């Protein structure tokens, strides 16, 4: 599986801080965990193993990458240790939006990982994971818990804060101009561009074409069933009102932190 086009390598570009549960020693730390890391091979300036390696071999080990800013992660790649036959064969992921409360990815799904030293295995996130920090928890391994990895995120310009889309929607076909009592008609609104997370939608009526019921104007609009792709606008009237048309403006706003 390939990395989504246009995504940013977070670890290689030092966009995230790294921490681990344990390190085998100072030469096997998180600084060596970047995908494709290779040591100098010069004995006079040995710069460590070609991976992060834990000092304890159990399912409580982890390596976490995080920051205080929200990112939309689109993929993760893993790789084994380049200078020994050690690699993680499966793992779980956990992530957090507030750096306090953690969530297991896909309800604790065990993700198949590597089978050799240097092959790269990539998993894409669809939809993207909105988080400040992500942790990888090795579950099974070959010889030792050792890995190199990379996290990929959307570039900042792809999700400016806040993201806003506007538009209008009308009844359009006089569906509510006859009959009595409660009557409704629904119009589905599709956003021009899909949001990354469910936005807040506000509506306001800008045009009313209707006949009163004994001097009373009875109509209402509601935004419902809001998703990242759109929402339903429900037009309502009641009594003896005849509503020929209503037009609403909408503003959809996505906040990312």
UniProtKB/Swiss-Prot annotation:
Keyword Metal-binding part of the UniProt annotation: yes
Binding site for a carbohydrate: 209, 218, 238
Linker: annotated span: 156-162
Domain F5/8 type C: start-end pairs: 10-154
Region of interest (Lectin-like), ranges: 163-257
The keyword Cytoplasm belongs to this UniProt entry's keyword annotation: no
Protein name per its UniProtKB record: Discoidin-2
């Amino acid at each position: 599986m390939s990395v989504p086009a246009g995504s940013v390598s977070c670890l290689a570009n030092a966009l995230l801080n790294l921490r681990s549960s344990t390190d085998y020693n100072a030469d096997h730390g998180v600084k060596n965990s970047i995908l494709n890391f290779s040591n100098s091979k010069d004995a006079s300036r040995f710069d460590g193993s070609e991976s992060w390696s834990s000092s304890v071999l159990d399912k409580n080990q982890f390596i976490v990458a995080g920051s205080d800013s929200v990112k939309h992660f689109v993929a993760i790649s893993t790789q084994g240790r380049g200078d020994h036959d050690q690699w993680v064969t499966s793992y779980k992921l956990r992530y957090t939006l507030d750096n306090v409360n953690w969530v297991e990815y896909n309800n604790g799904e065990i993700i198949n990982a590597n089978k050799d030293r240097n092959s790269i295995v990539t998993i894409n996130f669809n939809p993207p994971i909105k988080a400040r920090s992500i942790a990888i928890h090795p579950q099974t391994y070959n010889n030792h818990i050792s890995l190199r990895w990379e996290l990929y995120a959307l570039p900042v310009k792809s999700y400016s804060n806040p993201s806003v889309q506007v538009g209008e929607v009308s009844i359009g076909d006089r569906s509510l101009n006859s009959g009595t009592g409660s009557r409704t008609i629904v119009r589905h609104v599709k956003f021009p561009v899909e949001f990354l997370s469910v936005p807040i939608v506000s509506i306001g009526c800008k045009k009313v074409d209707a006949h009163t019921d004994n001097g009373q104007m009875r109509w209402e609009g509601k935004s419902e069933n809001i998703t990242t792709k759109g929402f339903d606008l429900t037009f309502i009237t009641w009594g003896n009102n005849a509503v020929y048309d209503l037009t609403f403006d909408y503003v959809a706003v996505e906040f990312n932190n």
